[in-house]
Amino acid sequence: MASEQNPLGLLGIEFTEFATPDLDFMHKVFIDFGFSKLKKHKQKDIVYYKQNDINFLLNNEKQGFSAQFAKTHGPAISSMGWRVEDANFAFEGAVARGAKPAADEVKDLPYPAIYGIGDSLIYFIDTFGDDNNIYTSDFEALDEPIITQEKGFIEVDHLTNNVHKGTMEYWSNFYKDIFGFTEVRYFDIKGSQTALISYALRSPDGSFCIPINEGKGDDRNQIDEYLKEYDGPGVQHLAFRSRDIVASLDAMEGSSIQTLDIIPEYYDTIFEKLPQVTEDRDRIKHHQILVDGDEDGYLLQIFTKNLFGPIFIEIIQRKNNLGFGEGNFKALFESIERDQVRRGVL
């Protein structure tokens, strides 16, 4: 039920919509991650991919909102669908709280929507679940669906936003004031040459988080590199929660997905710090998985290199730990800097 803490009745993420000038490449990425290509929209050139509770829409419309979004940004997350108890109630409540409504003639999809980060759209979806959802009502079966062996990714754990310097508080307040997100972490992260600050917000229903990143110092940091390539603020990465990250990476071995390189010295001490890790340590080293935690639990995570434009994917497995890998920030940041050096940015 909607409440003071959850004023719009938010219940989680229903879908992520992608727009891209290179449809074939995006399709291959989805397949390599274990998504099945199942359905197409009845009226639009939009294809539906699924893996467990992660739903992707790949928009190939030549005109309209997502087409223009891709022209502006390149490969992009043009919209998301967020689950709510009542879509019209959530939409009206969001607008009353200061959100900008999206007009019907602007949208590619027929659901109530507001503008979100970087003028992407947030649709409000109140039909979801196994028996009654938008994929049964608004989509139809493909003549030749592609059923892929899933890779163990069960839901979107978090999605990270990159914003211009001086606007982090604005976007933090957007999520807090309109949806009821709460701040759960603040980070000030330094690498060898660059730095950033980050707020992490949790949705009022507790189902997902949105960290917001802002660069520090000169414009060569990873956040400002993203903003330049993407032409504005937007979603930097999605994090897939895995039920077994080692098994997921074993299943993806040999695919097109490349992950960041971690210096071998990282593993000299990590298992002394976290002796409770039960996963195969040789496989952790082989896949260059990062590990972080405390006496109560730990998490395992890995990051791809930039996959589509400046956007990448994180894979995370949580074992009684709700953090973001704070203990790995220095190693991760320096790995990203090495990748920036390789690409001539630093």
Curated annotation (Swiss-Prot):
Gene Ontology BP annotations: melanin biosynthetic process; tyrosine catabolic process
Name of the coding gene: melA
Cofactor(s) named in the record: Fe cation
Subcellular location: Cytoplasm
Species of the source: Shewanella colwelliana (Alteromonas colwelliana)
Superkingdom classification of source: Bacteria
Gene Ontology molecular function terms on file: 4-hydroxyphenylpyruvate dioxygenase activity; metal ion binding
GO cellular component, one term: cytoplasm
UniProt keyword Cell cycle, yes or no: no
Signal peptide start-end: none
InterPro entries according to UniProt: 4OHPhenylPyrv_dOase, 4OHPhenylPyrv_dOase_C, 4OHPhenylPyrv_dOase_N, Glyas_Bleomycin-R_OHBP_Dase, Glyas_Fos-R_dOase_dom, VOC
Family assignment from sequence similarity: Belongs to the 4HPPD family.
Cofactor binding remark: Binds 1 Fe cation per subunit.
UniProt protein name: Protein MelA
Pathway involvement of the protein, from the record: Pigment biosynthesis; melanin biosynthesis
Induction: By L-tyrosine.
PROSITE patterns attached to this UniProt entry: VOC
Residues that hold Fe cation according to the record: 158, 237, 314
VOC domain sequence ranges: 12-141, 155-305
UniProt keyword annotations, A-Z: Cytoplasm, Iron, Melanin biosynthesis, Metal-binding, Repeat
